[in-house]
Amino acid sequence: MRLYMPTKVFFGSGCVSENGAELKALGSRAMIVTGKHSSRINGSLAAVEQALQANGQTYVIFDEIEENPSVETVAVAAGIAVKEQVDFFVAVGGGSPMDASKAISLLAANPSAIDHAEERLYHPEPMQGYPVAAVPTTSGTGSEVTPYAILTRHDLHTKQSIAHKWFADLAFVDAGYVKTSSYENMVSTCVDALAHLIESYLNTNANAYNPVSYTHLRAHETKANL
């Protein structure tokens, strides 16, 4: 069995402010990738801004990430990143900003690919991207510690994972950010997490880590019966 998870993870209340100096190693100018509202409401965006300011790092904010972000959106963001001379990215939000940030970092580091985003993102020819830090504000997707990025492809009328594997360099996991989530969002993201556990439980390629899924499935069952 071989395991590879290069993301450096900080976990706990206030972990962004306590460990914000870690962002210094990623670059000098950031693009914060997020949505319109939730990151402002739950305080995660403010925490990231304060950390960057304390480090003396400049930044721009791209807050146009929609649910299930499209190839077109990440191409627009990448174009702005190139113009603004961004050299690293901070994703703030759920799976959508985190997945988008990975794709944006790849395109921004390869400007000639921006006008051919579908072709380059879904072609196996290797591409290197800029560093990414992730600040998840929901449970479920796990995108902060996986190499995958799923985008909406309007040309094919479907969602599809890009061909490139790109891990976040840093992840700041503060469970306090979920407190302001709506009931509907909380339910959907918890079901997402449960689905991942079931996937592991049913996986025919079992390994030594599969018992972890059994433990958490039993925990879900216990809570459901309370």
Give the predicted meaning of each segment:
Residues G20, E49, V60, A75-A78, ...:
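Predominant activation on well-ordered alpha-helical scaffold segments within soluble catalytic domains
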Residues M1-F88:
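ATP/NTP phosphate-donor binding region
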Residues V16, I41-N42, V71, S96-S101, ...:
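Short glycine/serine/threonine-rich phosphate/pyrophosphate-binding segments
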Residues N210-Y214:
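ABC transporter nucleotide-binding domains
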Residues A81-R120, G129-T137:
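A short, small-residue-rich loop immediately preceding and capping a beta-strand
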